[in-house]
From Swiss-Prot:
Site label Plays an important role in substrate specificity, positions: 228
A Pfam family of this chain: SHMT
Gene from which the chain derives: glyA
Function: Catalyzes the reversible interconversion of serine and glycine with tetrahydrofolate (THF) serving as the one-carbon carrier. This reaction serves as the major source of one-carbon groups required for the biosynthesis of purines, thymidylate, methionine, and other important biomolecules. Also exhibits THF-independent aldolase activity toward beta-hydroxyamino acids, producing glycine and aldehydes, via a retro-aldol mechanism.
Species per Swiss-Prot/TrEMBL record: Shewanella baltica (strain OS195)
Name used for this protein in its record: Serine hydroxymethyltransferase
Length: 417
């Protein structure tokens, strides 16, 4: 029999210890992975609710199982809030992840073998934008576009490739690009060749919701996003459109269910509904502006200390530190910073001579530190410590000193105060 007082601590101490250790790690480490964030206790409450028990194949009002009257309310709340947040006329909140949302778009709009123009992974794109190791690169004919010598997206090259190869779909969006994307220009190019414009805004969705980064929804035929990252919601995906095309909406819905998924995760959809409501609050706009301010503050210190930033700066939440020419790989930098309780990720940079498992760069993002309450002063101080380690990565005394400083800073800014 099930009882309300059942808990993990008493039943499964090994698992409980791992959860405790992860909780402590999050409190005592500074999180700078650009795709990570801290979700609110309200989102976690929704994810831990009885909604996890309910199967709900189909869509609100059109389910294959009975007993869905209340989960219909939950999903409808999430849909309507997502539409309001991004100015969309269509939203599907069922994708289990951003990659599955992207997969559904491919399935809805293309046939295997169709030509797709997507951002080169080595220049800041994402696996699902055409990497040879991903379904997108295996099933479709991918033509990659990239950045110019200044580190900015090369729209002239994009247009030339589009006219030459006539892709059926163009993809905008990125996983490691610190600039502003000209969505209107991309739509202009897509219209010139009669292609779909699909934008994956996963990394900047929170900034877009807050109005501090341009919104692709008015320009693209279809937009996808994760619901974590800058949106600070549960791990999951969403598909949006403002195309006012019911046939397109039906294709997208069918591509999610039954095309790629079975039953939706109703407890996660409830978490999405909470996160979308939080993102509609005025304080969310303040938070997102601070995310950008903190990123700019970090770039300022990196440049002062002689470090190269791809594209020379940032206009969003992330930056890519280029270590080419230094006696330090991205992998080594990642490990050295990790020893001081600073979590980043190694990342390839444009024209990287090293393998993706070693790399010549690190990617850094500010959503999580800003969520803790860091402002420009803390961001600059932290960047100075990072540079101290990168300057002398094999010196254990420097790492130990910075670790102590990190622990003190974390104690001042608890994740869940």
């Amino acid at each position: 029999m099930l009882k309300k007082d059942m808990n993990i601590a008493d039943y499964d101490p090994e698992l409980f210890k791992a959860i405790q250790n992860e909780t402590l790690r999050q409190e005592e480490h500074i999180e700078l992975i650009a795709s990570e964030n801290y979700t609110s206790p309200r989102v976690m409450e929704a994810q831990g609710s009885q909604l996890t028990n309910k199967y709900a194949e189909g869509y609100p009002g059109k389910r294959y199982y009975g007993g869905c009257e209340y989960v219909d309310v939950v999903e409808t709340l999430a849909i309507e809030r997502a539409k309001e947040l991004f100015g969309a006329t269509y939203a599907n909140v069922q994708p289990h992840s951003g990659s599955q949302a992207n997969s559904a778009v491919y399935m809805a709009l293309l046939k295997p073998g169709d030509t797709v123009l997507g951002m080169n992974l080595a220049h800041g794109g994402h696996l699902t934008h055409g990497s040879p190791v991903n379904f997108s690169g295996k099933l479709y004919n991918i033509i990659p576009y990239g950045i110019d010598e200044s580190g900015k997206i090369d729209y002239d090259e994009m247009e030339r490739l589009a006219v030459e190869h006539k892709p059926k779909m163009m993809i905008g969006g990125f996983s490691a690009y610190s600039g502003i994307v000209d969505w209107a220009k991309m739509r202009e190019i897509a219209d010139k060749i009669g292609a779909y414009l699909f934008v994956d805004m996963a990394h900047v969705a929170g900034l877009i919701a807050a109005g501090v980064y341009p919104n692709p929804v008015p320009h693209a035929h279809v937009v996808t996003s994760t619901t974590h990252k800058t949106l600070a919601g549960p791990r999951g995906g969403v598909i949006l459109s403002a195309a006012d095309d019911e046939d397109l909406y039906k294709k997208l819905n069918s591509a999610v269910f039954p095309g790629g998924q079975g039953g939706p995760l109703m407890h996660v959809i409830a978490g999405k509904a909470v996160a979308f409501k939080e993102a509609l609050e005025p304080e969310f706009k303040v938070y997102q502006q601070q995310v950008v301010n903190n990123a700019k503050a970090m770039v300022e210190v990196f440049l002062e200390r002689g470090y190269k930033i791809v594209s020379g700066g940032t206009s969003n939440h992330l930056m890519l530190v280029d270590l080419i020419g230094r006696d330090l790989t991205g992998k080594e930098a990642d490990a050295a910073l990790g020893s001081a309780n600073i979590t980043v990720n190694k990342n390839s940079v444009p024209n990287d001579p090293r393998s993706p498992f070693v790399t010549s760069g690190v990617r850094i993002g500010t959503p999580a530190i800003t969520r803790r309450g860091f402002k420009e002063a803390e961001s600059k101080e932290l960047t100075g410590w990072i540079c101290d380690i990168l300057d002398d990565a094999s010196n254990p005394a420097v790492i130990e000193r910075v670790k102590g400083q990190v622990l003190a800073l974390c104690a001042r800014f608890p994740v869940y105060g």
